[in-house]
């Protein structure tokens, strides 16, 4: 699959491919297969988690920012071996996957998400909610994320943001 092929695909095919990549993305996180998570990005990717209030005002301050797949891998290594945090599990719910079009060989996609967090004590709460703004590109391995901007509506994060959203 090449970037030129993305614009040639029917909207239903674009939607299917985008939805599949998003499903793979949240499954890696929810099933704690975090070492596989960076493989869903291209090498020169951008991953940003930013509060809606900052995004709306054009402010650059992010809760998390990585500008390469190597940084994503480093984040997972730190999570597994250096960070100390309460054991928890995520469960994502995605909705309204909307392919906005193809621009410069990139599939522009927006979707909504809610993340439920369950702590080892068994309590489950809504941890975070917002939208994904994605730029996806075709690679020999299939569709991959060139850019993922996670814009969260949640006013505050109730505890440490360790695991990717």
Give the role of each language-model region.
Residues 43-112:
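A solvent-exposed, acidic/Ser-Thr-rich amphipathic alpha-helical stretch
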Residues 3, 93, 98-165:
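A beta-strand edge to alpha-helix "cap/lid" segment located at domain peripheries
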Residues 25, 37, 72, 109, ...:
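Hydrophobic pocket/interface hotspot
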Residues 1-31, 39-43, 50:
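Short, low-complexity N-terminal intrinsically disordered segments enriched in polar/charged residues
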Residues 8, 12, 16, 59-66, ...:
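Charge-dense, low-complexity intrinsically disordered segments
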Residues 25-27, 80-87, 120-123:
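Short helix-to-loop capping/linker segments positioned immediately adjacent to catalytic or ligand/cofactor-binding
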Residues 16-20, 28, 63, 70, ...:
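A generic "alpha-helical surface" signal
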């Amino acid at each position: 699959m090449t970037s030129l092929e993305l614009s040639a695909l029917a909207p239903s095919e674009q939607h299917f491919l985008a939805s599949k990549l998003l499903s793979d993305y949240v499954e890696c996180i929810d099933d704690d297969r975090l070492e596989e998570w960076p493989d869903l990005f291209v090498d020169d990717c951008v991953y940003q988690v930013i509060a809606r209030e900052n995004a709306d005002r054009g402010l650059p301050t992010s809760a998390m920012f990585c500008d390469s797949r190597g940084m994503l891998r480093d984040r997972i290594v730190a999570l597994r071996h250096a960070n100390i945090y309460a054991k928890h599990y995520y469960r994502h719910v995605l909705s309204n996957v909307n392919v906005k079009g193809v621009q410069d060989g990139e599939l522009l996609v927006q979707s909504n998400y809610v993340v439920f967090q369950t702590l080892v004590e068994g309590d489950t709460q809504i941890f975070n909610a917002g939208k994904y703004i994605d730029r996806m590109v075709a690679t020999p391995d299939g569709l991959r994320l060139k850019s993922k901007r996670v814009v969260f509506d949640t006013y505050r994060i109730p505890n440490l943001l360790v695991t990717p959203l």
